[in-house]
């Protein structure tokens, strides 16, 4: 952690335990106290780790929680509009994005809501990509050289993936 001085420079550094082999970190207020907490993806644990802001330049690590196989990138937004921030994770070997809904007390719903995407989802971004006023998720898919966009319409109550007739 590098503490900002407000002039483009940073003061000191502090290390906090954040899972095992963490790949990404996202800032999110998981317990609704007005202070930014952190969530890391722990690739080797197949889990996420929440670090709660103690409001004194320290963080307490909560227990790890499942997210899918080989979580790569994490993004945060209020996907449901309930005032609590939620998280989405790209799970590279499952070819899925998992969405866990924030409860506002430092925990998330389990099991997550899984969404199939093209091969090996990696980087992610959130925003209103289709102009409907709702937050969507974009993810890059490494092996297909494409970007998938999961719209809010299908994010919380996903439609089943259709099976082509030749696969029945």
Predicted segments, located by residue:
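Blade-level signature of beta-propeller repeat domains, shared across WD40, Kelch, NHL, RCC1
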Residues: 122-158
């Amino acid at each position: 952690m590098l503490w900002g001085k407000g002039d483009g420079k940073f003061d000191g550094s502090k290390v906090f335990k954040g899972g095992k082999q963490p790949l990404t970190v996202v800032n999110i207020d998981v317990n609704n106290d007005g202070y930014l907490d952190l969530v890391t993806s722990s690739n080797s644990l197949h889990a996420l780790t929440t670090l709660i802001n103690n409001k004194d330049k320290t963080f307490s690590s909560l227990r790890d929680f499942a997210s899918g196989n080989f979580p790569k990138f994490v993004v945060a937004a209020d996907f449901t509009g309930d005032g609590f921030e939620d998280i989405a994770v790209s799970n590279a070997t499952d070819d899925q994005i998992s969405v866990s809904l924030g409860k506002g007390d430092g925990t998330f719903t389990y099991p997550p809501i899984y969404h199939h995407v093209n091969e090996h989802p990696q980087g992610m971004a959130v925003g209103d990509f289709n102009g409907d006023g709702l937050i969507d998720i974009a993810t890059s898919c490494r092996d297909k050289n494409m970007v998938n966009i999961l719209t809010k319409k299908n994010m919380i109550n996903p439609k089943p993936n259709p099976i082509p007739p030749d696969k029945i």
